[in-house]
């Protein structure tokens, strides 16, 4: 699953749709973790969509990631500021790719 310490153990290597990207990133095979409040490990995400369905405040949007070995799209936490910390996404993710931490 996602490393719950990624916010301090991984360097910030970029910014995407208003949230940080934690590296390393070597596109298209290694995409890192997207988000700080709601972190999605893009290298674990298999795009089954359960988090998108479960989230009551629409934190996630699909993001195309052609060429990634796990899946060709990811659940991107573009609206992480809207998170109400219900943990529905964490609880339904089949590969434990999501970590939520209030700011």
Swiss-Prot record:
Cofactor entry: [3Fe-4S] cluster; [4Fe-4S] cluster; Zn(2+)
What keywords appear on the UniProt entry? 3Fe-4S, 4Fe-4S, Electron transport, Iron, Iron-sulfur, Metal-binding, Methylation, Repeat, Transport, Zinc
- One Pfam family for this entry, by name? Fer4_10
The residues listed in the UniProt record as binding [4Fe-4S] cluster, with positions renumbered to this chain, are: 55, 83, 86, 89
Q: According to the UniProt record, list the residues that bear N6-methyllysine.
A: 29
**Chain residues that bind [3Fe-4S] cluster:** 45, 51, 93
InterPro entries assigned: 4Fe4S_Fe-S-bd, 4Fe4S_Fe_S_CS, Fd_Zn-bd, Fe-S_Ferredoxin
Query: Which segments carry the region annotation N-terminal extension?
Result: 1-36
- Residues given in the record as Zn(2+) binding sites: 19, 34, 76
Bound how, and how many: what does the cofactor note say? Answer: Binds 1 [3Fe-4S] cluster.
Gene Ontology MF annotations? 3 iron, 4 sulfur cluster binding; 4 iron, 4 sulfur cluster binding; electron transfer activity; oxidoreductase activity; zinc ion binding
In this chain the 4Fe-4S ferredoxin-type domain maps to: 35-65, 74-103
What does this chain do?
Ferredoxins are iron-sulfur proteins that transfer electrons in a wide variety of metabolic reactions.
Protein name (Swiss-Prot/TrEMBL)? Zinc-containing ferredoxin
Origin species: Sulfolobus acidocaldarius (strain ATCC 33909 / DSM 639 / JCM 8929 / NBRC 15157 / NCIMB 11770)
The taxonomy runs:
Archaea, Thermoproteota, Thermoprotei, Sulfolobales, Sulfolobaceae
Name of encoding gene:
zfx
């Amino acid at each position: 699953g996602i490393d719950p310490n990624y916010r301090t153990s991984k360097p910030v290597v970029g910014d995407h749709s208003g949230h940080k990207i934690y590296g390393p990133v070597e596109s298209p095979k290694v995409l890192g973790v997207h988000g700080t409040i709601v972190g999605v490990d893009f290298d674990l995400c298999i795009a089954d969509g359960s988090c998108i369905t479960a989230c009551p405040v629409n934190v996630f949007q699909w993001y195309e990631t052609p060429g990634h070995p796990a899946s060709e799209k990811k659940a991107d936490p573009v609206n992480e500021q809207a998170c109400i910390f219900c943990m529905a996404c964490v609880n339904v993710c089949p590969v434990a790719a999501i970590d939520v931490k209030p700011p």
